[in-house]
Each structure stands twice: as structure tokens, then as C-alpha cells.
From Swiss-Prot:
One Gene Ontology term of the molecular function aspect: sequence-specific DNA binding
Protein name: Trp operon repressor
UniProt entry tagged with the keyword Glycosyltransferase: no
Gene Ontology CC annotation, any one: cytoplasm
Keywords noted in UniProt: Cytoplasm, DNA-binding, Repressor, Transcription, Transcription regulation
Organism for this UniProt entry: Serratia proteamaculans (strain 568)
């Protein structure tokens, strides 16, 4: 997959530097099998739960079997969170969408 831009226009210059430092740290943690303890160190239990919920939102939106309201009730997420997920998915590159489909829907999970 080609990377379009390393900079996130929603972040300040310092915010982008911090984000890229985090991404590099995360990549290195996977390479050294330290990703699980790193994420537990950096994220609270609530933040880890929220990330898991966001993955489920993307998965269910891609599956296309539930309305946003049904997702809200099923996952206990706010409608704004689901709408943000939907809008982000619409803005994702075709390559990312294809990769997500393989990862999240490939095994009929």
C-alpha cells in the first residue's frame, strides 16, 4: 500500500511529530513483540475498550448489515462515534478499504 502523506492536516506540526514518533514506536514494539505491554502502558482500560469498539464499528459498517442506530444499540457507542467512523471510512483510500475488508471480513469474523 502506498502512503499518500505522513502529515495529518488535522494536527499541528508538533502534533504530527508526536504522532509519527508514536507510530514508529508502535512499529518497533511489534517487531520486538512488545506491542501488548506498550499499549497497556500508554492506554487506559477505557481507551483500549474504545479502540476495540471503533474496530467493531468499522467492521460492522463494512459488513453493511446494520443501520447506524442498530450499531449504536448493539455496541453501546454514541451515534456521533459511529458517524465519525462512517465518515472516516468514506474518506479512506481504496487500498486501505480493501486491506480492512481482508482483515475484518476475510474470515467472516
Amino acid at each position: 500500500m502506498t502512503q499518500l502523506s505522513l502529515n495529518d492536516p488535522a494536527l499541528s506540526e508538533q502534533g504530527n511529530e508526536d504522532w509519527l514518533r508514536f507510530v514508529a514506536l508502535l512499529q518497533n514494539s511489534f517487531a520486538q513483540d512488545l506491542h501488548q505491554p506498550l499499549m497497556q502502558l500508554l492506554l487506559t482500560p477505557d481507551e483500549r475498550t474504545a479502540l476495540g469498539t471503533r474496530v467493531r464499528i468499522i467492521q460492522e459498517l463494512m459488513r453493511g448489515e446494520m443501520s447506524q442506530r442498530e450499531l449504536k444499540n448493539e455496541l453501546g457507542a454514541g451515534i456521533a462515534t459511529i458517524t465519525r467512523g462512517s465518515n472516516s471510512l468514506k474518506a479512506a483510500t481504496p487500498a486501505l478499504k480493501q486491506w480492512l475488508e481482508q482483515q475484518l471480513l476475510g474470515d467472516a469474523q
